[in-house]
Amino acid sequence: MGNLLDLFSQDNTILVPDPVYPVYVDDNVMAGRKILYLPATAENGFLPMPDEAPHADIVYICSPNNPTGATYSVEQLKAWVAWAKANDAVILFDAAYECFVSEPGLARSIFEVEGAKEVAIEVCSFSKIAGFTGTRCGYTVVPQALAGGKLNKMWLRRQTTKFNGVAYVVQRGAEAVFTDEGMKEIQQNLDYYRANAAVIAAALDEAGVWYCGGKNSPYIWLRCPNEMGSWEFFDWLLEHAHVVGTPGEGFGPCGKGYFRLTAFGDAERTKEAAARIKAALATL
């Protein structure tokens, strides 16, 4: 994702949702770009829409979202594509978690929207769909229709100059993902993580804790109980349940008072963690 910024001017204005995957912000801070924040809140379902957005040259959209688990519908993304066209902006669409989408009407790709090829770049990774974390293998779609094909040519030149591809053995592993056997195993893994998410969600439901995500995403985004702050809840959960999660505040100011749990884990450990969380919450 960070390599794409080589295609853009340093004086471009960047729009990111808040809370946000920190890399989007850090990449642009290091480049000296101006960053604008678009609040993603419980009131807008953690899916901010362009009618709330200021002008910007580049907007980041991650759907299903990290950290909130919220997922845009195709209809909602149509509005973002229209906004990008009206503002002569580029959408950088992070589809790393698209494999978790299961509900009809929710988007797995920005290119499900007509006209998106004129305004959007999509990035996806094998790290989530196939457990390829650390191998740095993924793919980027830079359409010919975007900026008259200029960005496509620039991206090809950039990649052949600065990056000659991941190791061959990794590429062959990625190729295996798309075989019948590979897709079957991946579906089994996805079902495994979905089951973990359901276990966590059930524990939170029984404890009366508000949350979103977990259905089309591996992440569950919960509101900290008793108006605790994110870090306060982190300390409390560690002390009383011996469970670790991620404080929402680490993803931006709008993450204050929220907390992220993940379904990426062993099933038995997830059940144990969920039981501990439920028991600890019962003492409040």
Task: For each feature predicted by the language model, list its residue ranges.
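Conserved glycine-rich beta-strand-loop-beta hairpin in the small C-terminal domain of fold type I
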Residues: 175, 190-201, 211-224, 255
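A short helix->loop->beta-strand "cap" motif at the edges of active sites that frequently abuts
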Residues: 12, 33, 86-90, 117-118
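Conserved core segment of the aminotransferase class I/II
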Residues: 113-194, 198-202, 281
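Active-site phosphate-binding strand-loop segment of PLP-dependent enzymes
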Residues: 38-111
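PLP-dependent enzyme catalytic core of the Aspartate aminotransferase-like
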Residues: 227, 236-246, 251-284
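Phosphate-binding glycine-rich loop
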Residues: 1-13, 228
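Helix C-cap/helix->beta junction micro-motif
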Residues: 31, 86-87, 207, 241, ...
